[in-house]
Amino acid sequence: MKIYLVGGAVRDSLLNLPVKDKDWVVVGGTEKILLERNFQQVGKDFPVFLHPETHEEYALARKERKSGKGYTGFDTDCNSDVTLEEDLIRRDLTINAIAQDEYGNYIDPFQGKKDIECGLIRHVSESFIEDPLRVLRVARFAATLVHLGFKIAEETMLLMCIIVKKQELSYLTSNRIWNETEKALKTLNPHVYFQVLYECNALHFFFPEMYFLYEKKNFLNRSFFKKFCNKNIILMGLAEISLLNKDIDVRFSYLCQFLSVNQIDRNYSKIFFDSYAASIIHSLCKRFKIPSYIRDIAVLNTGFYFFLNTIHYQSSKNIINLFSKVDAWRKPDRVKKLAFLSNFNFLRNFKSEFFCIKSGCFLEKCFSVVKNVSIKLILKKGFKGYEIKQEITRLRIKKLEFWRIKNIKHRFYL
């Protein structure tokens, strides 16, 4: 029985990247042998075991044969006579099909090291097309490695297009799609992920809302599209915001704020909270079961997008209503998230010399002015029930209005 380090740990080591998880393949072993050595079996579809001390994953070498549709339609052979090369050939990319033995020697039957040197993301074999999940994985690896000069091999992109054409993507679960998307959003260049999906014709299947951004003819409001929603501007913005902020909810929210404009042709200046735009994002998040902490910021930022961009002109009453709508009194961190996004949009979309304070900074300043209005004084005055809410809202509006009037001479806003 021989044990080899495989997959991402070998790849990242060769790339001088931090190694996060170590996966091992066991050649010539059996379930019985590993269980006798106190390994814990955890795999459902095929035998995977946790090391009794390190808790790293050890999988029996296996062969796979396509027997059905989608990424789960495989028959697996984990017999002890399966060779290392037979195990490696079933992997998606050459850079992920390198093994390392206990002495540090590399076993690289598919020239993965050469592809790493050349910066090439290339499939291992023609069986690549049997697993539709690989479309998302390749797009994600492109986003992960583009800063190191990697690109997708032309023949691999061709196979990705074939997978899409065969309609294999329909067998992917929403959970699988989001898992890969979430990983991509955490990379240095998440915009590359969506661009690759567009180039292999998969974007319209996974994210039809985003696909519309590539189809200008679908936009009703042409002038708005040209100014704010050109696909290159949006993807460039996603690239830029990712340099400034690592939070996935912020990155995702930036992207989402544009996804409803293809259906809208209205007077934005009169909108407090755009329920229609927010509902599109809410439906998207529901479709992929996106975590609530990401969904909530995305929905709020989209709904208040135009309000926040014109916050200098908004009434104190509406600003207080915004804080209540986003539940800022209990979740002040939401104000920081929305302020960051608003500042970013402000600096990209408007001439900042018009104002002495950015829209997001103004939002945070307003919140700092009113967040400590005391409810104790209201209770002492005998207010009860709904009257308490009305009175604290009135006091917050009054305090904010006083601050704004007092500071007009300092030109905090027009």
UniProtKB/Swiss-Prot annotation:
Q: Which Gene3D superfamilies match?
A: Beta Polymerase, domain 2, cca-adding enzyme, domain 2
**According to the UniProt entry, what is the EC number of this protein?**
2.7.7.72
Q: Name one GO biological process term.
A: tRNA 3'-terminal CCA addition
Q: Which reaction does it catalyse?
A: a tRNA precursor + 2 CTP + ATP = a tRNA with a 3' CCA end + 3 diphosphate; a tRNA with a 3' CCA end + 2 CTP + ATP = a tRNA with a 3' CCACCA end + 3 diphosphate
Keyword set, alphabetical order: ATP-binding, Magnesium, Metal-binding, Nucleotide-binding, Nucleotidyltransferase, RNA repair, RNA-binding, Transferase, tRNA processing
> Where is ATP bound in this sequence?
8, 11, 91, 137, 140
Q: Which residues bind CTP?
A: 8, 11, 91, 137, 140
Q: State if DNA-binding is listed as a keyword.
A: no
Per the record, the domain of life is Bacteria
Residues reported to bind Mg(2+): 21, 23
Q: Which GO terms describe its molecular function?
A: ATP binding; CCA tRNA nucleotidyltransferase activity; magnesium ion binding; tRNA binding
**HAMAP family for the chain:** CCA_bact_type2 (MF_01262)
- What is the additional note? A single active site specifically recognizes both ATP and CTP and is responsible for their addition.
* Similarity comment: Belongs to the tRNA nucleotidyltransferase/poly(A) polymerase family. Bacterial CCA-adding enzyme type 2 subfamily.
* Entry function: Catalyzes the addition and repair of the essential 3'-terminal CCA sequence in tRNAs without using a nucleic acid template. Adds these three nucleotides in the order of C, C, and A to the tRNA nucleotide-73, using CTP and ATP as substrates and producing inorganic pyrophosphate. tRNA 3'-terminal CCA addition is required both for tRNA processing and repair. Also involved in tRNA surveillance by mediating tandem CCA addition to generate a CCACCA at the 3' terminus of unstable tRNAs. While stable tRNAs receive only 3'-terminal CCA, unstable tRNAs are marked with CCACCA and rapidly degraded.
Instruction: Return the PANTHER family for the record.
Output: MULTIFUNCTIONAL CCA PROTEIN
- Its protein name is CCA-adding enzyme
Organism, as annotated: Buchnera aphidicola subsp. Acyrthosiphon pisum (strain Tuc7)
**Name of the gene this protein is made from:** cca
